[in-house]
Amino acid sequence: MSYYIWHGNPHWDGELLWTKLGQIYQGGMWFLKKDKISGFKASQYSNGTDYRSNSNWKTWNENDPYWQKTPVSGKPSNINDCFFLPAMGYVNAGTLNMNLGGYYGAYWTATPVLGDDTTYRALLLHFSPTVVGIEGQ
């Protein structure tokens, strides 16, 4: 997931329309497809470290810029090399919260990471018009 954020050339597209449950929304994030990202590794940072057992998650802080970056605004020019994630809001206590639909998107991964010496956290890719990053919950 980290490759998509730091090497996937994320672009916020506030113009693209999409629908959910019969409602029209607007906005989401474009990322390069994994076969278009040089050296893509699903469970590694770009330096080769396996993030599933990385002790950095012990000190994860969502306000630390280490875990996020600013996306480019607008649709990418190489759209056929990209995939789109709609800004569908987020899941809270098992319920999809769409009040931020069109502005904020959050997608869980199936990759657990060690949060401290005894517990695991789930990883979440999140984005808005001004930020794209990783959360460890």
For each feature predicted by the language model, list its residue ranges.
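C-terminal, surface-exposed recognition/capping segments
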Residues: 3-137
